[in-house]
């Protein structure tokens, strides 16, 4: 019995041709080069160095960063609103406490109490009710006033990316007009004028204090924004470098595989005897 003839070279080449490891290195290198040169592929990695418009800066005020923290401008507005609420509560509550206690003592001269402690406790209850009632009225009004004023002023400053005295005047006009809008059109106009007149000297005072300190709030915000932008740009460069080196790592890993062993296994499989023909094919013959 003759030995089976060796597998033809053409069959080996045909089996080895579509094998995925043959042209993988070249394909990976081509993909790496095309990624570096193709700007469309590089666009999938977001570039933080692009210029920002006024609306982009304004939108970032209400968006949390990567650490789920609000912007410093919004933090300043919230802190100012809380401080204004506390100051307003003290401004309206303390005089109301004293007035309510005095008024209760004047109106309760004819009342009969069991002891002195009961009379003092009743007077303190009346004073506490006055403190809570009038303190809350002044508190929420002051907090809303300061919040609207700071929001408009900060929004204009961030949008235009500079400090200006007109921002304080516009913020005062908007705040005063909204607080007097319940009086109709005349109240809206009068409140806007009064707010602008009060906002202008307040803005002048704040800007003078900032210049005296040597650094304005906008300059500090600009420095913080530039530092964040530089940090994002550095992170973007690292991510881009990792993305460009990934195909090279894949290529080096594929080159470490020994193709001789794979070729030997394919030759052994091709030398195995063929499967016997099926009964259907024999009947056809």
Swiss-Prot record:
Origin: domain of life: Eukaryota
Any one GO CC term of the record: mitochondrial membrane
Transmembrane regions: 80-100, 137-159, 165-185, 188-208
Keywords of this entry: Chaperone, Membrane, Mitochondrion, Transmembrane, Transmembrane helix
Subcellular location: Mitochondrion membrane
Membrane topology: Multi-pass membrane protein
InterPro entries tied to this protein: TIMMDC1
Pfam families referenced in this protein's UniProt entry, alphabetically: Tim17 (PF02466)
An example Gene Ontology biological process: mitochondrial respiratory chain complex I assembly
Coarse class of the protein's main subcellular location: mitochondrion
Subunit structure: Associates with the intermediate 315 kDa subcomplex of incompletely assembled complex I. Interacts with TMEM70.
Family: Belongs to the Tim17/Tim22/Tim23 family.
Function comment: Chaperone protein involved in the assembly of the mitochondrial NADH:ubiquinone oxidoreductase complex (complex I). Participates in constructing the membrane arm of complex I.
Name the record gives this protein: Complex I assembly factor TIMMDC1, mitochondrial
């Amino acid at each position: 019995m003759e030995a089976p003839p060796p597998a033809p070279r053409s069959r080996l080449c045909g089996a080895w041709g579509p094998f995925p490891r043959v042209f993988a290195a070249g394909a990976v290198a081509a993909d790496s080069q095309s990624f570096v040169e193709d700007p469309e592929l590089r666009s999938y990695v977001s570039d933080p160095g692009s210029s920002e418009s006024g609306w982009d800066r304004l939108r970032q005020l209400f968006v949390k960063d990567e650490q789920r923290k609000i912007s410093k401008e919004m933090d300043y507005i919230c802190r100012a609103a809380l401080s204004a609420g506390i100051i307003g509560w003290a401004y309206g509550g303390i005089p109301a406490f004293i007035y309510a206690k005095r008024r209760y003592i004047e109106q309760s001269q004819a009342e009969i109490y069991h002891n002195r402690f009961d009379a003092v406790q009743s007077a303190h209850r009346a004073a506490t009710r006055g403190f809570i009632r009038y303190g809350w009225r002044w508190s929420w009004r002051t907090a809303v006033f300061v919040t609207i004023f700071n929001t408009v002023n900060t929004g204009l400053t961030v949008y235009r990316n500079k400090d200006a005295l007109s921002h304080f005047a516009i913020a005062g006009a908007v705040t005063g007009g909204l607080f007097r809008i319940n009086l109709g059109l005349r109240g809206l106009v009068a409140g806007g004028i009064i707010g602008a007149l009060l906002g202008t000297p307040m803005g002048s005072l704040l800007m003078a204090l900032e210049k005296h300190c040597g650094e304005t709030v906008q300059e500090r915000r600009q420095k913080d924004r530039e530092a964040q932008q530089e940090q994002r740009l550095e992170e973007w460069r690292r991510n881009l470098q990792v993305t460009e080196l990934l195909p090279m790592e894949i290529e080096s890993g594929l080159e470490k595989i020994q193709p001789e062993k794979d070729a030997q296994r394919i030759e052994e499989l091709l030398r195995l005897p063929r499967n016997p023909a099926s009964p259907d094919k024999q009947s056809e013959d």
